[in-house]
């Protein structure tokens, strides 16, 4: 499956990536290759294989909750397309009822 330039441009826009023409073509080739691989995997007969949600038997391995310095809010929001009152502003995904 060869991706169109429009799809690559759309994915780049969603990821907020500014791509050069060379990067766009490389991304097109790589994403097309990944989708072809996934397509081959989907063709496999897995009926006799039980679903596996967890392959490692470890559970609840926690680390200490240490407070560490973080970036100032202003520095983080400087990279956001939109912000408001110290928060990221995003477009609504769900309609209000």
Curated annotation (Swiss-Prot):
Molecular function terms, GO-annotated: asparaginyl-tRNA synthase (glutamine-hydrolyzing) activity; ATP binding; glutaminyl-tRNA synthase (glutamine-hydrolyzing) activity
Gene3D superfamilies per record: Glu-tRNAGln amidotransferase C subunit, N-terminal domain (1.10.20.60)
Enzymatic class: ligase
Catalytic activity line of the entry: L-glutamyl-tRNA(Gln) + L-glutamine + ATP + H2O = L-glutaminyl-tRNA(Gln) + L-glutamate + ADP + phosphate + H(+); L-aspartyl-tRNA(Asn) + L-glutamine + ATP + H2O = L-asparaginyl-tRNA(Asn) + L-glutamate + ADP + phosphate + 2 H(+)
One Pfam family it belongs to: GatC
Known EC number: 6.3.5.-
Entries under InterPro entries matching the protein: Asp/Glu-ADT_sf_sub_c, GatC
Biological process per Gene Ontology, one example term: regulation of translational fidelity
HAMAP family listed in its UniProt record: GatC (MF_00122)
Protein family per UniProt: Belongs to the GatC family.
Designated name of the protein: Aspartyl/glutamyl-tRNA(Asn/Gln) amidotransferase subunit C
Organism: Thermomicrobium roseum (strain ATCC 27502 / DSM 5159 / P-2)
């Amino acid at each position: 499956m060869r991706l169109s330039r429009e799809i690559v441009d759309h994915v780049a826009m969603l990821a907020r990536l500014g791509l050069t023409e060379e990067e766009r073509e490389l991304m097109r080739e790589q994403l097309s290759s990944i989708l072809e691989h996934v397509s081959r995997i989907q063709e496999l007969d897995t009926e006799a294989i039980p679903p596996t949600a967890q392959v490692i038997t470890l559970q609840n391995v926690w680390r200490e909750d240490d407070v560490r310095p973080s970036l100032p809010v202003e520095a983080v929001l400087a990279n956001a397309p939109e912000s408001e009152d110290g928060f990221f502003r995003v477009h609504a995904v769900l309609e209000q009822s």
